[in-house]
């Protein structure tokens, strides 16, 4: 729709949906008799994206197919093809098992909890979070390093179930179909290979405490959290159908895997072992349950995690893609922040390569990318709101290296430029 203001010779165009004029928006798109602004287009895209989450291709039992789960994982997580395939199949089978639980009683299908093994910043946590988003089930994350046996200072393992209950708005039925991700699981390994007479309350003790809730038990949870009191009423949560995903970096596990089967010998006649020059992620692909036992996990705990998915180190190319391609890519996030100041942010390709190399040098993986970008853009984000005529900021390789400041491209902002109209 278009309106004419007073006796103006030039008509002012308005968005047919929100009513904003062409002076208030960046772009108007013209149809046969209507106009739509860029802000409304963006809002429509958000609505479509939300609806597409609930329109996943379902198999006959109402569970998303492994290929569909994998496709959505690809939107958020770059690389890690093997881990995505393992997770897609395991999660599909888990929820298919729940869908058929009451139909066939002749065969009891066991739960398949998942162990994610991969270097720091390789995407373990993001994979678990994305799975919960795809399946629209309650999700909670726990840090294994804060857990202790019941009766000791620290978090009880039952607090994990309480967090899941809170994530489901205290809907017990939904919580019982949720996903729990326990991070830093390698930090609760037994302190030595041999059982000790001293109590290991944050290592083996936590593994023992986790066994029952991972296997399936009815946990008594205080409805509003806090410590248990005798007069307090408890919510009963059955953990049998909760999917547990445990993840850890397992620093040092690659040495255990490499040494397996080689044997040891000493003396002048000893054979010289060539060092394993494979990357950590490649070595992890050969992991066996016996390696996890040597690392310090108890046999019963390893047995509760039958599905092993390993993640690889992220190389420079993968880190560059992570910066640019996912829906929540860091470059897109910062570009949106700059757009709010009506400034276009541009990264040169070589600059992104240098950012990726810095993350590899720091051994922080994808997790370290944000802090690197934050450091690069700090001064610019500090100065920009006070500058009048900046239209574009360009980040080159010299900026990443700290040798120069970003390039500011100025324009004439004295004139209020109306939104451009596309037919």
UniProtKB/Swiss-Prot annotation:
Q: Name one GO biological process term.
A: cell division
Reply yes or no: does the keyword Aminoacyl-tRNA synthetase apply. no
What residues bind ATP, as annotated? 119-126
What the entry lists under InterPro entries is as follows: AAA+_ATPase (IPR003593), ATP-dep_Clp_protease_ClpX (IPR050052), ATPase_AAA_core (IPR003959), Clp_ATPase_C (IPR019489), Clp_protease_ATP-bd_su_ClpX (IPR004487), ClpX_bact (IPR046425), P-loop_NTPase (IPR027417), Znf_CppX_C4 (IPR010603)
Gene Ontology cellular component list? HslUV protease complex
Query: Where do the annotations place Zn(2+) binding?
Result: 15, 18, 37, 40
The membrane spanning regions, by residue number, are: none
**Which Gene3D superfamilies has this protein been placed in?**
1.10.8.60, ClpX chaperone, C4-type zinc finger domain (6.20.220.10), P-loop containing nucleotide triphosphate hydrolases (3.40.50.300)
- On whether Membrane is a keyword of this UniProt record, the answer is no
Query: What Pfam families does the annotation carry?
Result: AAA_2, ClpB_D2-small, zf-C4_ClpX
Query: ClpX-type ZB domain location, by residue?
Result: 3-56
Task: Share what the entry says about its subunit structure, partners included.
Answer: Component of the ClpX-ClpP complex. Forms a hexameric ring that, in the presence of ATP, binds to fourteen ClpP subunits assembled into a disk-like structure with a central cavity, resembling the structure of eukaryotic proteasomes.
- Assigned protein family: Belongs to the ClpX chaperone family.
Function as written in the Swiss-Prot or TrEMBL entry: ATP-dependent specificity component of the Clp protease. It directs the protease to specific substrates. Can perform chaperone functions in the absence of ClpP.
Name listed for the protein in its UniProt record = ATP-dependent Clp protease ATP-binding subunit ClpX
